[in-house]
């Protein structure tokens, strides 16, 4: 196991490049200020050096908000986005320290979609980002590495990716949303696709509740969305 000093090498940190990407990004992004102790704990637990993009994001940020908060990239956690990457994945993609994760949840969006780095359980393309869509409740291979995923969220056509899923005044609603919440809709987004997003009722739910409702092996959809 490497020490924190071995994992953090400022002169070799990927953050040097990533911060330049962020400064020149086409899409709106906000780097959330980190809590130093949380950053150190998350990085040490993960044993990921800051020379890697994921290690740099964990150590240098409390998370990154993309497209006015629509998409949340997990860092080491913060008041605004109170989920560190390793803390969030514990009991979901791995259950013991040192265990190889079957996937790593690295980002999510406000409509209940999840981005995960495949460790082998999501498909054959190990090391690629998969997206769990709330439109069809299925994992889709985006064929991005983590680094390519960061480049895409910063400069790609996010509007096209979520075409038809932005409602009127969505930015105002997202601004009020807690980083531990997502929106769920009635009817669900995977039902009655002819119904426009603005014609669906929506409510905020705790993201842990949402995750368990979608991925718990038993009673998959029986958890009450009203539970905070």
UniProtKB/Swiss-Prot annotation:
This is Uncharacterized protein HI_0374. To E.coli YbfG. The lineage of its organism: Bacteria, Pseudomonadati, Pseudomonadota, Gammaproteobacteria, Pasteurellales. Pfam families: DUF2625 (PF10946).
């Amino acid at each position: 196991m490497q020490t924190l000093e071995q994992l953090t090498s400022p002169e070799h940190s990927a953050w040097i490049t990533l911060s330049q990407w962020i400064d020149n990004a086409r899409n709106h992004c906000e780097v959330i200020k980190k809590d130093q102790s949380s950053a150190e704990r998350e990085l040490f637990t993960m044993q990921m050096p800051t020379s890697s993009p994921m290690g740099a994001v964990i150590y240098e940020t409390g998370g990154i908000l993309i497209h006015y908060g629509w998409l949340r990239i997990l860092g080491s956690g913060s008041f605004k986005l109170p989920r560190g990457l390793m803390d969030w994945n514990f009991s979901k993609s791995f259950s013991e320290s040192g265990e190889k994760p079957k996937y790593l949840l690295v980002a999510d969006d406000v409509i209940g979609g999840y981005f995960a780095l495949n460790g082998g359980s999501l498909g054959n393309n190990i090391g690629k980002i998969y997206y769990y869509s709330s439109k069809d409740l299925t994992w889709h291979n985006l064929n991005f590495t983590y680094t390519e995923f960061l480049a895409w969220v910063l400069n790609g056509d996010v509007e096209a990716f979520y075409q038809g899923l932005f409602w009127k005044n969505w930015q105002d609603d997202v601004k009020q949303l807690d980083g531990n919440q997502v929106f769920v809709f009635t009817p669900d987004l995977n039902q009655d696709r002819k119904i426009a997003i603005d014609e669906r009722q929506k409510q905020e739910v705790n993201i842990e509740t949402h995750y368990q409702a979608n991925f718990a092996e038993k009673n998959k959809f029986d958890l009450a969305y009203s539970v905070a």
